[in-house]
Design a protein with these regions (language model features):
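N-terminal intrinsically disordered, cationic/polar leader segments
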Residues: 1-76, 81-132
């Protein structure tokens, strides 16, 4: 649990926390506010992310994600729901380029006998966990 510094990139700061604390498997939640945001939507037919840049202050209504390994390092995969001053909600895949205004977070580390490493999934075009 903790608070991120104002100006930190939200996604990178969460990944840095996981790396610094050697957290390789778990989940993350957060709330707070950002000065602007970048969220993505994965077009399943094109197998391509499209990004929405929201150039305004926003409240983090919910951020939920998981932590696993990608290329041997902890990776945070998070989705976020944000609201503007008029109460409109926006959401999607959290992308780099989302500076923190204020953010409190909690990480729940899983103690497992193995780690999950992301791998290319040719069926979806995404980097996913292996099938269970």
């Amino acid at each position: 649990m903790g608070r991120l510094a104002k100006g930190d990139d939200l996604l990178q700061a969460l990944e840095n926390f996981c790396q610094e604390h050697n957290i390789t498997l778990g989940e993350v939640r957060a709330l707070g506010a950002v000065t602007r945001a970048r969220v993505g939507f994965y077009n399943q037919e094109e197998r391509k992310y499209y990004f929405l840049d929201l150039e305004q202050p926003l409240e983090i209504l919910a951020l939920v994600g998981n932590i696993s390994l990608k290329d041997g390092k902890p990776m945070v995969h998070a989705h976020v729901t944000l609201a503007d001053a008029a109460g409109r909600a926006f959401g999607g895949h959290l992308a780099p380029g989302t500076p923190v205004f204020a953010c409190e977070f909690a990480v729940h580390e899983y103690q497992a006998d193995r780690t999950l490493a992301r791998q290319d999934d040719p069926e979806t075009g995404l980097m996913l966990w292996p099938p269970s």
